[in-house]
Amino acid sequence: LRAKLTFTARDGEGILLPLHYNHLLQHLIYHLLPPDFAENLHEEGFRYGKRRFKLFTFSRILQKGRFRKIEGRRRLFFPQGFSFCFATPRYEILENLIREALLRRSADLLGQEVFLSRVEVCPEVELREVMFLRFLSPVTVYRTTKVEDKRRTHFFSPADSEFNQLLLENARKKYFLVTGKSANGLKFTIYPYRFSPERNKAVVLFKGTPIVGWTGVFKVEGDPELLEVTYQAGLGNKNSAGFGMWEVWEDKREKEQAGKE
């Protein structure tokens, strides 16, 4: 279940955001849900052992903002408003979001009144056992340990052997929460395809905390039903903070070449 949400400002004034805006989009999503539903989703979510999953994700803003310097800080300005994609495997989340958002229509975003001007439900896609995906928001996977009473977080890169395994373990937990079935027999493997460790590394500040993620195009092989859950809920960690959303990617040059043959 996916939708593209478009927000505009009053009288075409445009919308101004900080460079690191994930927490603001998350706030916007929760604000546009019914209050009781939003509180339960945020505080409880869907439990798997000690872990709690929100089972939704969202993309980066789809438009390129214009840089502006205000009070010595760089900001992003969106003169025509902005759009982002939202996904969830839970029908009730998307239903509540769209219904409540259409009723309210407006929300406060850093003192700016923004309006939900358009909702586009995305068509379903067919997922295959072998395909390519492109991240619409950085994928992050990490492990937190305690060293001398201090919590330390180690972020893994696609070059690390644990990267794929941790993504798989995370996806299996989400699969169980969505379907109620064990995913122990299901698997997938992900390989960098069009990827550069320098160009595709993304460090996002989320409420002041740096989170390391990765963008780019990857090849994935695995069970479509497991991939379907990650398509709707996101790959990796921090999905509800705007990480791990992906789309099916096709090499246009290869398609054009095949059409000529």
Give the residues covered by each predicted segment:
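RNA-interacting cores
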Residues: 1-261
